[in-house]
């Protein structure tokens, strides 16, 4: 499927998305965090000016915080804090949807790595906490809100995953299973992950008949280098549009969630998201509906264990300078698992 010349030629059923390859920041004070927030607010305005038909602008993971992995309270955010309020107001002012990244204060443990989707009226439509922090590098609390989906612009259904989440095929499958036709993936990845980034963005799309829109931070903060690499993938796994390494570029594409929904209903061959739960429906009525996967049974029973479990070397963050944790996982009050 064509990209509509980067969304310049918008179809009646099209959703135009911009992926902002934001220059990598390095804030260490509340004032610096606020200055970076204002830069993102300015990029929301740029998105609207540069493409009047754009429906959604997506910012990468770490777009406010940078890659320092600092958990300092002065650079943590909250849903009702000034940074989030400024981002919401920017969406309302410019009548555009936005996807944003915050490092969220957590009084019960380490901060969460959280993502928000805000509509064009400034309302939060989706709130997600990263399920799979990039261990052993990242110190964030494992997410406890599940994988939500929300109604998006122009009849789309959106899901959001963050960076390392996308390396687990179960994440994208859950998004699709809950109805998402467009999955957003925000990241701070650096160049060594480039190949894995591309193939997982493609496989996540193809195996679930879902369009994916993914973007990393870009450029250098003097220590770390992020790669940009914005990428749109169609539901058949083909790349529709992609960016390079130019910081602050907004890469745009028109997606067609209506064609995703059509494929999910009408495809026979490689309708994998359906066939996964209806094995061999040519031979048996409705297909086999059982669960033959040992790891699924074990994970749900709390006994997930690999044959080589005792030999795994890295099982905490000590190799990256973090103290070994002493507490067990406990969902925060009010979470879906509490």
Swiss-Prot record:
It comes from the Bacteria. One of its GO terms (molecular function) is formamidase activity. Residues 15-257 form the CN hydrolase domain. Keywords: Hydrolase. GO terms for biological process: putrescine biosynthetic process from arginine. The active site is at residues 61, 130, 163. Gene3D superfamilies: Carbon-nitrogen hydrolase. It catalyses: formamide + H2O = formate + NH4(+). Signal peptide: none annotated. Its EC number is 3.5.1.49. The keyword Hydrolase applies. Pfam families: CN_hydrolase. InterPro entries: Aliph_Amidase/BUP (IPR050345), C-N_Hydrolase (IPR003010), C-N_Hydrolase_sf (IPR036526), Formamidase (IPR022843). Belongs to the carbon-nitrogen hydrolase superfamily. Aliphatic amidase family. HAMAP family: Formamidase. Is an aliphatic amidase with a restricted substrate specificity, as it only hydrolyzes formamide. NCBIfam families: PRK13287.1. This is Formamidase. It comes from Pseudomonas syringae pv. syringae (strain B728a). The gene is amiF.
